[in-house]
Amino acid sequence: MLAARLVCLRTLPSRVFQPTFITKASPLVKNSITKNQWLLTPSREYATKTRIRTHRGKTGQELKEAALEPSLEKVFKIDQMGKWFVAGGAAVGLGALCYYGLGMSNEIGAIEKAVIWPQYVKDRIHSTYMYLAGSIGLTALSALALARSPALMNFMMTGSWMTIGATFAAMIGAGMLVQSISYEQSPGPKHLAWMLHSGVMGAVVAPLTILGGPLLLRAAWYTAGIVGGLSTVAMCAPSEKFLNMGAPLGVGLGLVFASSLGSMFLPPTSVAGATLYSVAMYGGLVLFSMFLLYDTQKVVKRAEITPAYGAQKYDPINSMLTIYMDTLNIFMRVATMLATGSNRKK
């Protein structure tokens, strides 16, 4: 599942720099597919025989042409539907924040249970989020350093199969490496692998630096607000409220994963390309926001149930990786939305 989140992360940046949506569709660009109607009127043998009208259905070739033909008016409508979907998700999130944050739920949440937590549970959660902050900082530094290298930036932005394959291999390899090293037995190699993983993810984020510092700073603030609000919801909600969403989230991740891959091969101005792109971006934003709720409660649950002196030790670096990937996916989609909005105003 972590590998699928990595793929969803990698396939977004190339779309930011392609011409996408505009506010009004040009009247010169219209859908050229016409609906042919065939009227079959058999010879009349009797005065009472009625005319029979049948509609010829579209062939597979016509459906393919309709899906791939540029239609900016339809693309704009698809984009608007995606934004309304995100707005609906934001409204639900605000409602949940008010409901659980104001203590209107009768069930006990993690924030109430924190009063009776042993000190080692508090230390585990604290160290997990400290590593999360460190990962975000290392990722930002890595992205800024790579942005100063024209050769590396050209390599990351080419979009060739070699670039995509090398990026996937580096992300998956670094993720497997950092998870395979023991936190207790090999703290030195574990931290080196953690820094390597954050650096690789910074290389993936680096193409977004072309959008400019002010826009990325806004995206960072918006992401901080989203992550902070959702983390508060997860902490105030009943401790296992969102842990039952694993199966639906897995299905949604598969859909966003397939849409992210499919959008790489279709033009963004076609109906099919715009639909897949909207699912990958807007649907992905809502999906990874829900993943953040799930992963936050999963981290808290793991910190509570892992024995203090058991054979299996708590690993704060491995625990924070899923929250880290959720945060990066949210940030990249917010930055993409802000970039397309800025281009539309121009």
Swiss-Prot record:
| InterPro entries attached to this UniProt entry | Bax_inhibitor_1-related, GHITM
What GO molecular functions are on record for this protein? calcium channel activity; calcium:proton antiporter activity
Show the CDD domains listed in the entry: GHITM
Per the entry, what span does the transit peptide take up?
1-45
- Posttranslational modification: Undergoes AFG3L2-mediated proteolytic degradation, upon hyperpolarization of mitochondria.
Compartment annotation? Mitochondrion inner membrane
Q: What are the entry keywords?
A: Apoptosis, Membrane, Mitochondrion, Mitochondrion inner membrane, Transit peptide, Transmembrane, Transmembrane helix
Keyword presence, Mitochondrion: yes
A GO term from the CC aspect? mitochondrial inner membrane
Give the membrane topology.
Multi-pass membrane protein
Main localization is: mitochondrion
Any single biological process term in GO: apoptotic process
Instruction: Give the multimer and partner information.
Output: Interacts with LETM1 and AFG3L2.
Described function: Plays an important role in maintenance of mitochondrial morphology and in mediating either calcium or potassium/proton antiport. Mediates proton-dependent calcium efflux from mitochondrion. Also functions as an electroneutral mitochondrial proton/potassium exchanger. Required for the mitochondrial tubular network and cristae organization. Involved in apoptotic release of cytochrome c. Inhibits AFG3L2 proteolytic activity, stimulating respiration and stabilizing respiratory enzymes in actively respiring mitochondria.
Q: Which family does it belong to?
A: Belongs to the BI1 family.
Q: Protein name, please?
A: Growth hormone-inducible transmembrane protein
Please name the source species. Answer: Rattus norvegicus (Rat)
